[in-house]
Amino acid sequence: MKLRLKIPALWWLAAFLPAVSPLAVAQDAPPEEPRRYFRYSLSTIDDVTVYSGLQVPLPIVLNQFLVEPTLTFRYKPVWSFSTSLIGVADTYTDSFTQLRVKEAYAGASAGNFDITVGRRMVRWGTGYAFTATGVLDPPRMPTNPTDRLNLNEGRDMVKADFVHGSSALTAAWSTAALAPASADLHDTTAFRYNVLVHGFDTSLIAGDDRGGDAFGGFTFTRVFGEAWEIHGEAAWREHEAILGGAKYTTTNGITFIGEFFTPPNIPYFQETSTPLNGRQHYLFLTAGKSRLRELPGWKQWDLSVSTVANLNDLSYTAIIDATRRFGNHFSSYLHMEVPAGNSRSEYGATPFTAATSVGIRFQL
């Protein structure tokens, strides 16, 4: 009698298991990516800069109000479009408003190939405050390497990428037709080969500026554990330019960055209005910490101190940055620059003794 009861039970169990298994597999399968993806953001900055000891006949207060909307749209994994605009209202010697296009590009992907057309910001150089190989990058400003007002704009280009395993090949052509005349840009053709070799992220870069010079370069980045990183660049454009740097993060979250940069004395690398004699040598040092302490009232603070120095004329600029966050959307900041040096030196010739910027940022 007991045997008769067990046999039907086994039949029911055998019939039920095949029905359950596909259900379990379906529940374990990752969800499919949406066919359409849309994301937008909005940020505003109200910035006031006060110049102390101004040595030229200009107002001592500069006020800027910036609005930056950004949106990204993707259809399937193939098509994409992204744009980032910035509206600037400036009150200084005169009041004016302008609209800048930071980025506006469309992209298509097919297998290992990606094609991008439009204005795009890229970062080929590995340097934090300087770069020798960032031929298509926005310009680096050593006293403001993070671009705190988000004023950098991309280059207008057609770019194609081919990725295979741990290597990638990029070909880009950039036009200067839509760039401001003050930017002093040329039509640029550039190639970049990136590959990971024994833990070193390396790149070979080559190209040519129309009406200018051909150039070539090499970059590398290497991370050691969770604390150390080294990076470097070497480039040739009429003469050699060398950059070397390192980053170290302590166990309590303090980050130190140091860079040494020596460019040749040619117009491409000379960003100052004062003519410089011969090859220059620069040093950049910074120490900073996000979330000063994991305690209420402290973890909302970020603080960093930096200095950039010209080792030839011994002039320098000291920089202090402090940020205080209020919730998820608001933050305030302080940015101060104090130049020092002989009046005929690079940083000593700065026409003020200090520039102090304070601002409020809103992000949505």
Where are these regions (language model features)?
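Detector for outer-membrane/organellar transmembrane beta-barrel domains
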Residues: 33-34, 197, 221-309
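Repeated loop/turn-to-beta-strand initiation elements of outer-membrane beta-barrel proteins
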Residues: 77-81, 112-115, 166-171, 197-204, ...
